[in-house]
């Protein structure tokens, strides 16, 4: 608006200068000059009123647009706040549910692991019990036996195995004592017929898991024990007179001492 007013003022000044020049040149027609002065004043007041009206209208439009923009910004902020609140609530709800699900999964895994371990322990225990029952019921005859009778039979088996081992040890020691060649353990004597008992036969005969006897009723133990029984004897080869070693053997070889305690 300021530039337009300046242009108008410049135009008016030019017009006024032209009017004064015309007045000087022409002294005639004094009435026409007075009319032009009145018209110039009217145009100036109209222009000033138009500019005031235009500035007021433009200010009103600017205030209205500013108010509208402020309302839009306020509405956006309120909507964003509400959306942010809703989003935060939803995310918190999802996080809570997810953490709950994770805790349930973890508890379930721990429970499954503990159940698996307990199941394995139960299976191992059951297998042990089945093995024991199988050992007990190897010679099961389907008879009407009580618990005491079964336990008595088991004790008889154990005692019989112990007696058998002692008898075999005693017989082996006496057989070895009778044979003089067994004092020196040479590599060639393992295949000799006079050896009688090999290590394999001794190991098989001493196996406790095989039952090689018949079940007999338990007899009362006697108060006196035979001091010369085979179970109480121990035999050592150190008391046997040494013989000359076989040819080709070293002089540093010493006779071995073998003893079989009565256990």
UniProtKB/Swiss-Prot annotation:
Residues 59-78 are annotated as: Calmodulin-binding. A motif (Nuclear localization signal 2) lies at residues 107-114. It comes from the Eukaryota. GO terms for cellular component: nuclear body. Residues 46-75 form the IQ domain. Residues 25-38 have a biased composition (Basic residues). One of its GO terms (molecular function) is calmodulin binding. A motif (Nuclear localization signal 1) lies at residues 21-28. Residues 16-41, 216-263 are annotated as: Disordered. Keywords: Calmodulin-binding, Nucleus. Residues 226-241 have a biased composition (Polar residues). It is found in: Nucleus; Nucleus, Nuclear body. Belongs to the IQD family. Binds to multiple calmodulin (CaM) in the presence of Ca(2+) and CaM-like proteins. May be involved in cooperative interactions with calmodulins or calmodulin-like proteins. Recruits calmodulin proteins to microtubules, thus being a potential scaffold in cellular signaling and trafficking. May associate with nucleic acids and regulate gene expression at the transcriptional or post-transcriptional level. This is Protein IQ-DOMAIN 9. It comes from Arabidopsis thaliana. The gene is IQD9.
């Amino acid at each position: 608006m300021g530039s337009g007013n300046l242009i108008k003022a410049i135009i008016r000044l030019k017009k006024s200068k032209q009017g004064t020049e015309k007045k000087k040149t022409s002294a005639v027609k004094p009435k026409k000059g007075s009319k032009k002065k009145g018209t110039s004043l009217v145009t100036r007041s109209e222009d000033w009123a138009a500019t005031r009206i235009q500035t007021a209208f433009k200010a009103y439009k600017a205030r209205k647009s500013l108010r509208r923009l402020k309302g839009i910004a306020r509405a956006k902020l309120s909507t964003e706040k509400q959306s942010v609140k809703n989003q935060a609530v939803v995310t918190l709800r999802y996080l809570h549910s997810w953490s709950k699900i994770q805790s349930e999964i973890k508890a379930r895994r721990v429970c499954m692991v503990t159940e698996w371990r307990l199941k394995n322990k139960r299976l191992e225990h059951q297998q042990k019990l089945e093995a024991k029952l199988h050992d007990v019921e190897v010679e099961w005859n389907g008879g009407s036996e009580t618990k005491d009778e079964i336990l008595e039979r088991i004790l008889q088996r154990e005692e019989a195995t112990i007696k058998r081992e002692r008898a075999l040890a005693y017989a082996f020691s006496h057989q070895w004592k009778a044979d003089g060649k067994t004092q020196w353990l040479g590599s060639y004597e393992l295949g000799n017929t006079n050896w009688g008992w090999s290590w394999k036969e001794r190991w098989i005969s001493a196996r406790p898991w095989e039952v090689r006897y018949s079940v007999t009723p338990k007899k009362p133990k006697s108060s006196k024990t035979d001091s010369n029984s085979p179970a109480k004897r121990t035999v050592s080869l150190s008391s046997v007179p040494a013989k000359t070693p076989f040819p080709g053997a070293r002089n540093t070889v010493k006779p071995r001492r073998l003893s079989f305690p009565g256990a």
